[in-house]
């Protein structure tokens, strides 16, 4: 499979060099015009700069997808685990709003009842579950991005790139949630049911004994409701925000930015995307939290009981969490790509063939 995907990726419109030499009819004029000292200007050797960028693998190769998956493991596993205390308080606000009246009150009550160690409840299923989710989310996103773009062709890929980002991310998240569901169910039980279990080792056998495999996968449909819109927004908003930042905000082209400068743009775009992600996915997140706490309940019953106001409980805490989380995930993921010297194509540009059709070239 990877060999066929790699073959397609070589002709992929996303697989463009970081530095391109585009003949605009002014190159000869610029190269021969005198400089400040009266000497002829030497043409900038951008091709030589591009050659110096040595990649560890080809774009769309099996190694590329595997290392992207590794980047997903590192970015999702570490960030979600680091934010376990905030996630714990957010979940408790959703399932027991009478007791946990707000984010600060939630922390105060939790510290009073469980101590500092209580804030780390559920760290093991969080780390395992979101590491597996990150592997599938980022790894499969790159796979589907290549496959769908080659199905569309170069011109349609550019014209419909937002739809492509949405489709590729939704496809990837479908599989990622199947990997996440068992650990998410265990995490919510540990965090929201006092006395049920303190560790994953205690919770998993108890859940299986009570409800069988259903205990681990009954929340997968609400997870899809929460995570697929979230991930679609996360990837599409990030990709288009990066494109807009380089076009309207960053004062120089991406090819002239240093790696640290590029990573700053990545972080900013990630945070902007994260705010929208939190808003889009929060109602389903509330349903998942309550559903995994209660035995024998269903998503429709929970949604009916919570009502419109109830599903938005804990939104402020989630905006802080998801905004920070998404920014850090994109920053770490892009840093992993830099570390392993993976191809990182710049924001897409209109193909020359499309420019000619639209009469944008002379």
From Swiss-Prot:
Modified residues (Phosphotyrosine): 196
PROSITE patterns: SOLCAR
Name of the featured protein: Solute carrier family 25 member 3
Keyword Chaperone attributed: no
Subunit and interaction comment: Interacts with PPIF; the interaction is impaired by CsA.
Native source organism of the sequence: Homo sapiens
Superkingdom, natural source: Eukaryota
Gene Ontology process terms (BP): mitochondrial phosphate ion transmembrane transport; phosphate ion transmembrane transport
Single GO MF descriptor: phosphate:proton symporter activity
Pfam families on file: Mito_carr
Mitochondrial intermembrane side: 50-63, 142-161, 239-261, 334-362
Keywords tagged on the record: Acetylation, Disease variant, Membrane, Methylation, Mitochondrion, Mitochondrion inner membrane, Phosphoprotein, Primary mitochondrial disease, Repeat, Symport, Transit peptide, Transmembrane, Transmembrane helix, Transport
Regions of this protein lying in the Mitochondrial matrix compartment: 87-121, 184-218, 285-314
Solcar repeat residue intervals: 63-147, 160-244, 261-339
């Amino acid at each position: 499979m990877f060999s066929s995907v790699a073959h397609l990726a070589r002709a992929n419109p996303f697989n463009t060099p970081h530095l391109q030499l585009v003949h605009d009819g002014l190159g000869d004029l610029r190269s021969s015009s005198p400089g400040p000292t009266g000497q002829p200007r030497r043409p900038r050797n951008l091709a030589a700069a591009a050659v110096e960028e040595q990649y560890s693998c080809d774009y769309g190769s099996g190694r590329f997808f595997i290392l992207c998956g590794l980047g997903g493991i590192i970015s999702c596993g570490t960030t979600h685990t680091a934010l376990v205390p905030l996630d714990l308080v957010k979940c408790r606000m959703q399932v027991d709003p009478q007791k946990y009246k707000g984010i600060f009150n939630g922390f105060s009550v939790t510290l009073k009842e469980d101590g500092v160690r209580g804030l780390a409840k559920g760290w093991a299923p969080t780390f395992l579950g979101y590491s597996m989710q990150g592997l599938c989310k980022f790894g499969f996103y790159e796979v589907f991005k290549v496959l769908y773009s080659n199905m569309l062709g170069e011109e349609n890929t550019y014209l419909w790139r937002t739809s492509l980002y949405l489709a590729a991310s939704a496809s990837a998240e479908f599989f990622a949630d199947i990997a996440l569901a068992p650990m998410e169910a265990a995490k919510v039980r540990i965090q929201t049911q006092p006395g049920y279990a303190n560790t994953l080792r205690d919770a998993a056998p108890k859940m299986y004994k009570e409800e069988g495999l259903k205990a681990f996968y009954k929340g997968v449909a609400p997870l899809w409701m929460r995570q697929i819109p979230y991930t679609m927004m996360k990837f599409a908003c990030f990709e288009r925000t990066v494109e807009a930042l380089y076009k309207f905000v960053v004062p120089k082209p991406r090819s002239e930015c240093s790696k640290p400068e590029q990573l700053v743009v990545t972080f900013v775009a990630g945070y902007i995307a994260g705010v929208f992600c939190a808003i889009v996915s929060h109602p389903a997140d509330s349903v998942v939290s309550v559903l995994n706490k209660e035995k024998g309940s269903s998503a429709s019953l929970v949604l009916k009981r919570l009502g419109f106001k109830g599903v938005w409980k804990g939104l402020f805490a989630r905006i802080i969490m998801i905004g920070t989380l998404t920014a850090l995930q994109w920053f770490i993921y892009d840093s992993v790509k830099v570390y392993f010297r993976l191809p990182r194509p710049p924001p897409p540009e209109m193909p020359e063939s499309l420019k000619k059709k639209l009469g944008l070239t002379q």
